[in-house]
């Protein structure tokens, strides 16, 4: 079995090789603005999953996916030539869900900001319930300052 460090290094190298090959050698007009975001290799180094994103609408994504599938053989041979491993891993291209997840998170954050602004606007003229000074003051302070001389004189005269 191979260690995870070797698989990680091979995955990083596959990502770079596929991105460079798509940029330099693949001239398919269906291939749009494709970005290779990640690559993962199984523990036995036989299969590699390459994640990609495409800038554009669903039609351009489908066309780019078809172009990647048709260029899979050229990309695999280039990966085998540049990595020098005994068995060249088979490539599987998967659209990355990262942009969709990021868009969902941004929408949720926008909703939270809108609700915060709404609460802030509602609470601008509000006052807290209860007194302005909610703390109790000891009653002994008032009595000591008013009758402190009487207490001292009282027991002495009796």
From Swiss-Prot:
Domain of life where this protein originates: Bacteria
SUPFAM superfamilies noted in UniProt: Ribosome-binding factor A, RbfA
Biased composition (Basic and acidic residues): 148-158
GO molecular function terms listed in the Swiss-Prot or TrEMBL record: ribosomal small subunit binding
Subcellular location per the Swiss-Prot or TrEMBL entry: Cytoplasm
A Pfam family hit: RBFA
GO annotation terms (biological process): maturation of SSU-rRNA
Cellular component, GO, one term: cytosol
Alphabetic keyword roster: Cytoplasm, Ribosome biogenesis
Location of the region described as Disordered in the Swiss-Prot/TrEMBL record: 114-158
InterPro entries associated with the record: KH_dom-like_a/b (IPR015946), RbfA (IPR000238), RbfA_dom_sf (IPR023799), Ribosome-bd_factorA_CS (IPR020053)
Family the entry assigns: Belongs to the RbfA family.
Subunit structure: Monomer. Binds 30S ribosomal subunits, but not 50S ribosomal subunits or 70S ribosomes.
Role noted for this protein: One of several proteins that assist in the late maturation steps of the functional core of the 30S ribosomal subunit. Associates with free 30S ribosomal subunits (but not with 30S subunits that are part of 70S ribosomes or polysomes). Required for efficient processing of 16S rRNA. May interact with the 5'-terminal helix region of 16S rRNA.
Protein's UniProt name: Ribosome-binding factor A
Protein's organism: Streptomyces griseus subsp. griseus (strain JCM 4626 / CBS 651.72 / NBRC 13350 / KCC S-0626 / ISP 5235)
Encoding gene, per UniProt annotation: rbfA
